[in-house]
């Protein structure tokens, strides 16, 4: 079997496992989001970490995505601001609290926080700050990765908390320790990371299920259409005024 096929099979197996084990929680997450949308309230998605940020971008200003999604795109942990800088900031105690404060999350809001490892300081502090403010929290992370990471690892929050232990609803992404899944003969380090596929699948599944739940109540939530198709700009423009000024990065 060639390596591309091996990687393909790994990706498919991960997605199957998510479907088999996390469907109920994905439905619960969709219910939480649908309640926000029915009240015309935003829900926030934060991926504190270099590649975890991709998860928040996946649901934001995205064709087929809910317009009520507000991505927390803090420059501190974006790779475009410097990869090593991003890593150091996501390990900085207190930083996550500053980010939540900057987006002014408040009681009754909903935060989805995505981090494959679920241990770093920015992740844990963001959840702790959100909970202090009465914000509902959903976490997407690997329980296995967090549980197998030693307490003295430098990325860990001083509390030693794991994301999945402190959120209101935890969705287990099942990512193996180290993320990469493909072994190549003669190479010590594995290649072929998997977490971006899994995070995108989980988040888009939540979007789909949220929309389906709302449809059962005869509610049509505003959904982005690609600006690169005929009529896309016209479709989106009818909703922009509802969200401009509310969604920080719009």
Predicted regions and their residues:
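Glycine-rich phosphate-binding loops that contact phosphosugars or nucleotide phosphates
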Residues: 48-201, 207
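A short, well-structured juxtamembrane/interface segment
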Residues: 21-36
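Short glycine-rich phosphate-binding loop at a beta-alpha junction
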Residues: 42-47
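Conserved, well-structured ligand/cofactor-binding cores
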Residues: 8, 93-97, 121, 243-245, ...
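Generic N-terminal amphipathic, Lys/Arg-enriched alpha-helix
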Residues: 1-20
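Active-site phosphate/pyrophosphate-binding segments
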Residues: 25, 39-41, 64, 212-250
